[in-house]
Amino acid sequence: ALPISGTTYVDGKNIQDYPIYEVSEYVGSVFQNPRSQFFNVDTDSEISFGMENLTYPREKMKERISKTVADLDIAHLTGRSIFELSGGEKQKVAFASIYAMSPSIYLLDEPSSNLDMDAIEDLRRTLELLKKQGKTILIAEHRIYYLRELVDRIAYMENGAISDRKSVV
């Protein structure tokens, strides 16, 4: 039988002991289907949404959005309707909304699932940037070829449990 419960610790703290808004200050997640995490109909509002919920001052939000747009090279996605974006563009906006909050830990569920080869290369560069920034990145992914030179460890899952671990460094 698959495990149906467990405990998650981040920096030695059980995250169940903290309200979700506190956890979201240092852990950001991007779902496999970005549509399921959108709360707005335009890209600019979506990118700022998390910061608004954490009551960032307006100036800090503007600063973080500018940095996000520049770092992720997504100026072409600003000021647009979510409904006119491709799957890969939606994935980039979902990631940008998390990146703008600058969490120390990123949880990514199948981040390459909606992406073509060029967009996967963009994703790889973005992950490289996060690694250089000292961020922790946990990725659930079927396509691992693009991650091989980026990751420190790989854990293989089978039937809901870790079946193998490899150190890549």
Where in the sequence are the language-model features?
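Conserved ABC transporter NBD signature motif
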Residues: 4-13
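H-loop/switch region of ABC-family ATPase nucleotide-binding domains
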Residues: 141-142
